């Protein structure tokens, strides 16, 4: 009898662990990337890095799909759902319509969408306060500029990208009320995210007008912006991931969105049975948004510049500085 009792007690820790192990085995995460692919050195790649970190930590593989055209998004989401993948991450606002359709078809599965909101009982939407980080980027650009003229190159002309541009302009004028801010959008279709040649052309045009710092929020198109700025001896500003290393000494900073952390956290919560539908908003206050400072830009960002930007960050978090969000009313001050 005593031997049986000891055997039962020894088995308890193993039995207690079984639900967790089963849950870890049940999760089958997947990602459908946006146009530009998972190695765009920007938005998609940050998501991919988060998935890689999750796999490294848990040994759970993440199935990935890179669409080559607009029509493949819904098909990819549906195919992954039919395979029982869950949670499925849809990368980018362009997937909102497709995700709304597919999530309704598979109500027992979990979905995550980045950069827009889809209201459904099985969807978690993760959005960012891009206007806050763009404001800081604009401040730094104006502080660094020798001409008082700075530029912005966006990808697809949509409210989200105008949100970046609006925050950038507000920050630039906060640092220098006389600053001129040039703005160009690459196009009106998703191909605008993957046209570095056009990005370079728009950058050179702004440089010819006197801009010496250009911020890009344009996916793979932005790589052309950074290249053109570096070639001309000017400064670019990276976006989404830390792009400072692409042209050391010529990328003033990068406005980083911690998409990697957001995705890794979403997968981990699902694995632990804590998936929560609804909207999650990340900004400066929780380090969901930040500027990148490292050895690659240390020599071009002075201590005085850094101090002013750091103070502005604190003031935004404290509510002393209110950065207007373009998407609240589709307008921008100034």
Where are these regions (language model features)?
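Bacterial N-terminal signal peptides
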Residues: 7-19
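Positively charged n-region of N-terminal signal peptides that target proteins for export
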Residues: 1-4
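A residue-level marker of the well-folded mature domains of exported/periplasmic proteins
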Residues: 24-334
